[in-house]
Amino acid sequence: MKILVTGFDPFGGEAINPALEAIKKLPATIHGAEIKCIEVPTVFQKSADVLQQHIESFQPDAVLCIGQAGGRTGLTPERVAINQDDARIPDNEGNQPIDTPIRADGKAAYFSTLPIKAMVAAIHQAGLPASVSNTAGTFVCNHLMYQALYLVDKYCPNAKAGFMHIPFMMEQVVDKPNTAAMNLDDITRGIEAAIFAIVDFKDRSDLKRVGGATH
């Protein structure tokens, strides 16, 4: 099994991005699967262009995109990506699309095809906080998740794809009182646990357990 893992460069005035720092620490093999980690720019279309190049060349069995969600208290596999860019802040090249479809020929939304409930369970088993998230936002993270699912549907129809947000690293909250953060090694362990579940459930349906929210 081959798994493509992506991490964004820093954005929004941050000097580092825990997504990129964490994937740099991943081993080359997890649970027998070959892991390829790539950096993607926090730029709307360019992030998808880089992803497409690697999907076409690597032909992965699964794509896991990782992104920073400052303020979240644990690792959060995303349930759905919507066909809409609505940027609260500009991306790293100054693009700020508002109410713009990501793909004119794409679906209104794509649900993650990764075993998100099993991923949460595996992260919990590693002793780390995790939960299913029902919104990936409308910035570059949602954009890349949507593009990943669109591209896999077009170029690797038997592959799975999805996205997981992670919290700030400790170093990022020194001047942000009362903001949640995690140690980088723990973030990396959580990603490894999620990948272990992706491999473990490659030929099985996801766990049937509560992961929803009331609001």
From Swiss-Prot:
GO terms for molecular function: pyroglutamyl-peptidase activity. GO terms for cellular component: cytosol. It is found in: Cytoplasm. Its main location: cytoplasm. Pfam families: Peptidase_C15 (PF01470). Keywords: Cytoplasm, Hydrolase, Protease, Thiol protease. CDD domains: Peptidase_C15. The keyword Zinc does not apply. InterPro entries: Peptidase_C15 (IPR000816), Peptidase_C15-like (IPR016125), Peptidase_C15-like_sf (IPR036440), PGP-I_bact-type (IPR029762), PGPEP1_Cys_AS (IPR033694), PGPEP1_Glu_AS (IPR033693). Its EC number is 3.4.19.3. Belongs to the peptidase C15 family. This is Pyrrolidone-carboxylate peptidase. It comes from Streptococcus pyogenes serotype M1. The gene is pcp.
